[in-house]
Amino acid sequence: VRYLFVHQNFPGQFLHFVRHLHEQGGHEIVFISEANAGEIPGVRRAIYRVPRLPSSSTHQHLREFEYGLLRAEAVATAAKTLKGLGYVPDIIIGHHGWGELLNLVDVFPGCPILGYFEFFYHTDRNDVGFDPEFPPGPDLAAAVRVKNAINLQALSLPNGYGQTPTQFQKSTYPGWAQDRISLLREGVNLELCQPDAQARRRNLVINGVKISPRDALVTYVARNLEPYRGFHSVMRALPRILTERQDAQVILVGGDQVSYGAPPPDRGSWKDIMLKELEGKLDLSRVHFVGKVAYDDFRSLLKRSDAHLYLTYPFVASWSLREAMATGCPIIGSDTAPVSEFITDGVTGRLVPFLEPDRIAEVVLELLEDRKQARRLGQGARGYAEAELSLQDYLERYDRLVEQVVSRHSC
């Protein structure tokens, strides 16, 4: 099969599948992306460059869409070059979030496009208006509607097909669109992410922070420390945890930028805001902000964790949740739809109200005290991962989906 992948940040969500195709052999794989240092054996890369940023005169709500159209044009130009060199794919696979796929129907008419649909925005549900501490501004509804412009264009493409990794994400799309989107649950490397019974008997050092076997380790991981991922609720739970467990150590992984939602006021960071709010209430000698960590350190942290916190608004679940389950962490997750799709309370973890720090602290303390329950939940999480999140099963399902799509078309 001749594959054309497109993702501005090579290889994006497609790393495992591209490697799998190379190992299968017999495929021709080309990947259009912006320039970066990434490299995968057997993959030819074609680089595109966006000629300019959105105009400052463009309406602020439309700038993201304009940037998507600029990307679409640049990707189409790269695709025309490939076509001129004789390359015509059997299938195009990419992520619809940045608009890159929109013009490829004009370059390769009849070629199926299997696009990754991540999230459809709504003005009255899911993440918008979820947290009363941050009520929607007067202009937010208009901005949210426009954020779906690329989504809607993508859903109208001829020969277009969709994939999405969770039922929750699929449910965000309009009913008329869901029939075009296949549920393809993403897998985890179960060998790389697996429990280590000896981890709690060794010292752990993460970015200079040392955790001994005597410590009760509470962990929290996010790309960035921000409200969308429950950072404020976690921080407000810490005073009680640290007071009632003098052996507790807390490691928080994540940067100080903003991945989702509004930036903090005064150009500060949410970490600074929460530290100021909780000044005098935290034993900061036992609260460790380690920033972003290497993947091996991340895995070591999960293997050692005595209680792992994962909270999110009703939005896209992080990869780290899947990896924590595969590692057999005792997980305390927010009782929000993207998390409850993975975590069954009392079976594969514990669910807590996102907005109730005292309840979060209570359940963390319960798991730190009741190690038998914590072990049972960790085993349940690992069992779920083995049954539902196997990387090999995911790749086999991906193969079947591609086969179904390609069989319906001829480029």
Predicted stretch roles:
Residues 52-62, 111-151, 191-203, 212-213, ...:
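Acceptor-binding helix/loop patch of EC 2.4 sugar-transfer enzymes
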Residues 142-203, 268-269, 273, 398:
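A short, active-site helix/loop in glycosyltransferases that binds the activated sugar's phosphate group
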Residues 313:
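Aromatic "clamp/platform" in nucleotide-sugar-dependent glycosyltransferases that forms part
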Residues 204-229, 235-240, 250-253:
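Conserved donor-binding/catalytic core segment of Leloir-type glycosyltransferases
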Residues 258, 262-292:
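Nucleotide-activated donor-binding/catalytic signature segment of Leloir-type glycosyltransferases, i.e.
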Residues 359, 366, 373-388, 394-400:
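A short, well-ordered alpha-helix in the C-terminal region of glycosyltransferases
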Residues 345-346, 350-357, 366-371:
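Conserved acidic donor-binding segment of nucleotide-sugar-dependent glycosyltransferases
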Residues 330-333, 343:
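Short hydrophobic beta-strand element within catalytic cores of glycosyltransferases
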